[in-house]
């Protein structure tokens, strides 16, 4: 073996080490991005599930209020009908009927909106819609994290193989997929598109 051959082998080895180091560093960065994407996807699904439950609870409470409100309206209407059927009712009984009708109507009206405790139908509907909006946002985020995880996992495999096989094309393919995974991760958090 001549000195020139030895020098060429050393240069090839140094170039190979440089490519391996670059691939290893890229794998490390992509593994970190993969962990962040996985965390984001997990949190998005938890949030979507939680907000869906809260929206369902708010709608159920709304329906219960609506049923109670309807019951009071029906009771008031029934008492009004009884009052109309009995024009000769004594004054005390008539006053009691009118008082009860007024109470029922006030309660039914109060159920429409209760800003003091935020449990009126209007407030419950607004709360349910807000939970739905948050749920929908989380549902829009989740697929981006899934895309990111897939792209990043494949990129890491390609980069690992590029080290073993010393194939630059695999490094570049892994880098492109890794970049796509990174962009998908960022979009999962911020929903740019």
What are these language model-derived features?
Residues 22, 150, 154-193:
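Juxtamembrane interface at the cytosolic side of transmembrane helices
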Residues 126-152, 158-163:
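Short, aromatic-rich amphipathic segments at membrane interfaces
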